[in-house]
Amino acid sequence: PTHATSDMNMAEDRIGPERIRGAYAWQRFRAQGTVIAAGSDFPVESPNPFFGLHAAITRQGHDDQPDGGWYPTQRLTAEQALRAFTLDAAFAAHQEKSLGTLEPGKWADFILVDRDIFAIAPQEIWRTQVLETWVGGVRVFAR
């Protein structure tokens, strides 16, 4: 999703006013039954997943621009965005039986963060910090 907010200043000039309406059109895709799988787009974009969640939910840069978001009807909800980065990304990689959710029999890869992204202002999500990282049920990082 960060590529949308990175591209918003030049995308319409490059692909035109007609085609831009179908670009980055996440809610339109969802309405047609498309699974939206999200990732960081690293190395072109930051690997920080909270930058991507912020972009998907607000469709704004870190400066809160543009007002209301770029093509705001295409914003994802926080729940939709988190699913795109977890279960739907695992589905896209044909790994949904072992990744994407915390369930018995799955790998138990997860992070603990310093805030509840569902309880804060969407414009603050990109500031989220990881406190712990767990891989296969083992803590591998602690702040």
Feature locations, PLM:
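His/Asp/Glu-enriched, well-ordered alpha-helical/loop segment
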Residues: 1-119, 123, 128, 132-136
